[in-house]
Amino acid sequence: MEPGAAELYDQALLGILQHVGNVQDFLRVLFGFLYRKTDFYRLLRHPSDRMGFPPGAAQALVLQVFKTFDHMARQDDEKRKKELEEKIRKKEEEAKALPAAETEKVAVPVPVQEVEIDAAADLSGPQEVEKEEPPGSQDPEHTVTHGLEKAEAPGTVSSAAEGPKDPPVLPRIQEQFQKNPDSYNGAIRENYIWSQDYTDLEVRVPVPKHVMKGKQVSVALSSGTIRVAMVEENGERVLMEGKLTHKINTESSLWSLEPGRCVLVNLSKVGEYWWSAILEGEEPIDIDKINKERSMATVDEEEQAVLDRLTFDYHQKLQGKPQSHELKVHEMLKKGWDAEGSPFRGQRFDPAMFNISPGAVQF
């Protein structure tokens, strides 16, 4: 699928929503489509059935999808709450720092002031306030020197932050990645988050809040590379770029924009194996600590039928009831039991009369 084609889905769905006018009727349209055009509402009552879902499975699937996005919404609420609290805290710190800056009469550059609030104000602010002398007793040279010392301290912190070993702000342990659905079986990196299942990968590249339309971003995918950029007036600003650690299927890979949040890129794996990293040079994750269970969504129809039959047989065996191979033979025998000319016609059919080996039945 060509980059940008995923936006067609948003436009189509938005058109439906605008036409019906409310979410309830919008959901009716979606589930009506599933009812008319798919086997979503068809019950899988027998292991030999090749279409439909076991009783309760379709409802559980809908609930699972709902819970997934409900969890994401709760995370968004928590994130907005933390951002608001952080803004309030910064404003309070700026208000406290303003009188001291006016007393010293030193113009502190804005970037330095921001770093000072984050790194130095919490640690040394109270002690410096206690040691301040009355304005009349301060020497001008001392005042200027004092201001330069304060300007250099944040720079030291900034240079330390730019070193090869950043502070442990991002989680580094796989157990922490597993707790976040966006980094499940993946990792959180400086400029993107990725997760994976048996057949696909999902990469989230954060964008500024003003990025609301697909034309404001540029995504280029090849079998071995990825590039995500933000379109600006003077060109493009690259958000993520590099060589993939494995090949992808570009025809079934796609991307979309979550307005004001991130570019969501779905990569389709060429082979069914677990990735330890998205980009070459990226710190690999510990494959032994991820969940390697294969999702039922990745199982094809034939494999799904076998799994359903084995599950059915297991529960039947626990309850002492006939298994699928026995039921199939019983059904065949029952048809001929009362047939014209049968010596058993008129007698009650008793399945217990027959001992049927599983190998005697071909599914």
UniProtKB/Swiss-Prot annotation:
Domain CS span(s) in chain numbering: 187-279
Protein name (database record): NudC domain-containing protein 3
Keyword Zinc: no
Gene Ontology cellular component list: cytoplasmic dynein complex
InterPro entries named in the record: CS_dom (IPR007052), HSP20-like_chaperone (IPR008978), NudC_fam (IPR037898), NudC_N_dom (IPR025934), p23_NUDCD3 (IPR037905)
Xref: Gene3D superfamilies: 2.60.40.790
Region described as Disordered: 120-143
PROSITE patterns in the cross-refs: CS
A GO biological process held by the record: cilium assembly
Organism: Mus musculus (Mouse)
Keyword Nucleotidyltransferase: no
Phosphoserine: modified positions: 342, 357
Residue ranges with Basic and acidic residues bias: 128-143
